[in-house]
Amino acid sequence: SEDDFNSILNQKNVFKYLKISNGINSRITKSEYLNNASKIKNHILRGDIYEVNYCFEYYAEDINLNSANLFYKLNKLTKSPFSAYFNIDGINLICTSPERFLKKINNDLISQPMKGTMERKSMKTFDMQEAKILKKNPKEFSENVMITDLVRNDISRIAEKGSVIVDEQCGVYPFNHVYQMISTVKAKCKRDITNLDIIDACFPMGSMTGAPKQRAMEIINKYEASQRGIYSGAVGYFNPNGDFDLNVV
């Protein structure tokens, strides 16, 4: 809806741990956002793409920030399983991500695309009725299926023939404040490829681009006002054995 543009900015509690002189600003105006959204819808109607993850940037200047403290508070609030923090040469990343991009253990690969979100009304219990409502939502379900198919196709490029499976389609999981719909794609990677080959075939995560991925990224590059930087990227670890686990930023 037209109110979506300002909804984030109006959530003052999100920024209560920051001391900001000039407020939070958007890189684009509301009219520019709506105009671009309309153009992207036309791409979908013409059959150029099925969906695009269209984003815009909020920014602040002259802020007084204790990044480690902010990360601690946000992580305590969200309890996200793939949170990440670093502070290197004055560049800070504060990430409370719920989504896994790609994990490798020995020859096994797993990716867990996340599409489909609904507010969680009760934090104490897992409400099966709420979960069913999310899973039966045709928009959320179809988005998840499309991105899962994209991820399956990406992984198949570096996987042993016949090894790619969708282990779970559109499972609903409770997180703090929301339910998320997650699918799980598994495969056996080919023996003669490197970790760089694997990431090159699968990056960036389809849930952050759209489908088909290449065309979605072209449209993102055309309509988004600023480069995403590390946003939509990945943070994780590689161990000495060559295994890794990466999130979606």
Predicted regions and their residues:
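Extended alpha-helical targeting/anchoring segments
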Residues: 1-249
